[in-house]
Amino acid sequence: MATVLIVGRPNVGKSTLFNRLVGGRRAIIDDQPGVTRDFVFGRVFWQHKSFEVVDTCGLFDSPKDIIEEKMKEVTLALLSEGDLLLFVVDGRKGLTSADMDIAETLRKSKKRVILVANKVENVDKFTLEVLPELYSLGFGEPIPISAEHGLNIDVLLEKIIKTLEEAGHLLDYEPEKEEDNLKVAIIGKPNAGKSSLFNSIVGSDRSLVTEIPGTTRDMVDETIEIDGMPVTFIDTAGMRRKSKVGVKNVEYYSVMRAVDAIERSDICILVIDATLGISNQDQRIAGLVEKRGKGIITVFNKSDLLNEKHKESLLSSFERELYFIDYSPVVFTSATEGFGIDELLDKLFLVAEKIDLRIPTGLLNNLISRYTLSTPPVGRKNKKAKIYYAAQIDTRPPLIMLKVNDPALFTEPYLRGIRSTIRMNIDPFEGTPIFIKLRRKK
């Protein structure tokens, strides 16, 4: 697929343009320079054409810290992968020395470049005051737009598609195939190693990795093919405790999208720092996954730093503190060393199979009948609880419908017993919750 990179100095509106092109608030937008710390990949669909667009983290003129230095380093490396570069400048303020330096870098890359003047709401003022100096960059006629207001975006899209097709790229697409992918969200506390794990799986340094908590603030999606199956991995921002996230804080948007990532995933990989153990926040995150009925795999990352006794202690801790997802496979990994990744992928495909598993109705009813005979429901007062019929009515997660005389007579511990007997006698349903819906028999 053709790849279009959005490049430019900080705060010229690259993320706003990205969001306008792909639709939705995918990259975080704020007024402070450098607020987009990750590459964010999206796909543009327009008039039966499609291409990939990448919101880069910005070419920093003089890196102020390790994060900015690495962003510049990786962004420069990414230029070689792009088929077309959108060089975004500020159409209100005109060119700066940083713009000139970036222009020189882009010329040296020998890539196709479209010059985009953003924030142009007043075309007459732009034409008189800014346009003449833009021609001096040597990238041809600039395209004035306002990403915030959607002005001239159609003209830009036409130019992008024409340029790519003239270069020999085939942009026709079949959108119905897009939803076939297994979707996997990588979640967990900040600095647990989610980005390193993500990179080990996809085999690309696309998600910025440092030792500073919270460097992954945008969702970064990567689709790879494993044994012929397309799998989309969602690398999310570390989930903060609610008390630490202010409504106006830019981290707020990341937390909200982390929850969104769980919502749109089929399976979640919960990454826990093995050197720190299971925290209350890990329990809360696991609870979010369980309540939303998503498949789950628990990963103790950084386990290369542990001995066998410590690993056994973590397993005991898992049984105590994450008992409500005791069906989750547990994998010990070291993303930086690369071990445990094959086992993780094996578990991923196992869970992918289980979330779609269906129990034959006859087998299910036979098991429920035997269970109610050996462990009859208590009921309340003088009223007995009765189960007349059972059937699995859905998958992702497996949903069992029980036709009963009165739903109020069935306690959660009793339903938990039904789930357990299904796992023990029919299938373990590794990595997936089993939901039970009670319906009164008419």
Curated annotation (Swiss-Prot):
In this chain, GTP 2 is annotated as bound at 188-195, 235-239, 301-304
Query: In its keyword annotation, does this UniProt entry include Repeat?
Result: yes
Task: Give one GO term, molecular function aspect.
Answer: ribosome binding
Amino acids binding GTP 1: 8-15, 55-59, 118-121
Taken from the UniProt record, the cysteine pairs bridged by disulfide bonds within this chain are none
Q: Where in the numbering of this chain does the KH-like domain appear?
A: 357-442
Q: Which Pfam families match?
A: KH_dom-like, MMR_HSR1
Q: Where is the EngA-type G domain?
A: 2-168, 182-356
UniProt keywords (A-Z) are: GTP-binding, Nucleotide-binding, Repeat, Ribosome biogenesis
Q: Name one GO biological process term.
A: ribosome biogenesis
* InterPro entries membership: G_ENGA (IPR031166), GTP-bd (IPR006073), GTPase_Der (IPR016484), KH_dom-like (IPR032859), KH_dom-like_a/b (IPR015946), P-loop_NTPase (IPR027417), Small_GTP-bd (IPR005225)
How the protein assembles, per its UniProt entry?
Answer: Associates with the 50S ribosomal subunit.
Q: Which family does it belong to?
A: Belongs to the TRAFAC class TrmE-Era-EngA-EngB-Septin-like GTPase superfamily. EngA (Der) GTPase family.
Reported function: GTPase that plays an essential role in the late steps of ribosome biogenesis.
State the protein's name.
Answer: GTPase Der
Give the organism, scientific name. Kosmotoga olearia (strain ATCC BAA-1733 / DSM 21960 / TBF 19.5.1)
Q: Which gene encodes it?
A: der
